[in-house]
Amino acid sequence: MRILSIEPLSKAAFAPFGEVIETEGSDYFMINGGSTRRYHALAEVQTSAPEDRAIVSIFVARALPMPLTIRMLERHPLGSQAFVPLRGNPFLIVVAPPGDAPRPEQVRVFLGNGRQGVNYQRGVWHHPVLALLDDDEFLVIDRSGAGPNCDEHFFGEDEQLLLHRP
């Protein structure tokens, strides 16, 4: 079983999978009479049909026991999905490039620092949210609309991956 290495989350490293949502290193402009910096369009919400809409939700996640065997990844073929931590806690991001099925050798793991969110592009394979603390909260922005928008891929026993706590 391959043990996954954890990388720090950066815009450059995560670019094949979507956008990192963060203010550090991002452009802004002043609004509200100069009292507020607006970091504009840090990520793009993707939908696939005119009747689709972007929605905002909150997920409350529990920490999964570590080490964690990665048995499954999911993707959303009809829209992007963004996760922004609300409590400032680090979290893990497990991803693989879009395609018919994720390949174990292409799976990567990133550690968000608690001040960064991620926006998975449509079709990017990813593990469900991986909080490191119980009852951690995430703002989630994704697509709502007709049609199935969650495909799951289960790895064969010889393809499963192991993730240790950072």
Swiss-Prot record:
It comes from the Bacteria. Catalyzes the catabolism of the allantoin degradation intermediate (S)-ureidoglycolate, generating urea and glyoxylate. Involved in the utilization of allantoin as nitrogen source. The gene is allA. Keywords: Lyase, Purine metabolism. GO terms for molecular function: ureidoglycolate hydrolase activity; ureidoglycolate lyase activity. Pathway: Nitrogen metabolism; (S)-allantoin degradation. PANTHER family: UREIDOGLYCOLATE HYDROLASE, UREIDOGLYCOLATE LYASE. SUPFAM superfamilies: RmlC-like cupins (SSF51182). Its cofactor is Ni(2+). Homodimer. This is Ureidoglycolate lyase. Belongs to the ureidoglycolate lyase family. It catalyses: (S)-ureidoglycolate = urea + glyoxylate. GO terms for biological process: allantoin catabolic process; purine nucleobase catabolic process. InterPro entries: RmlC_Cupin_sf, UAH_cupin, Ureidogly_lyase, Ureidogly_lyase_bac, Ureidoglycolate_lyase_dom_sf. It is an enzyme of class 4 (lyase). Its EC number is 4.3.2.3.
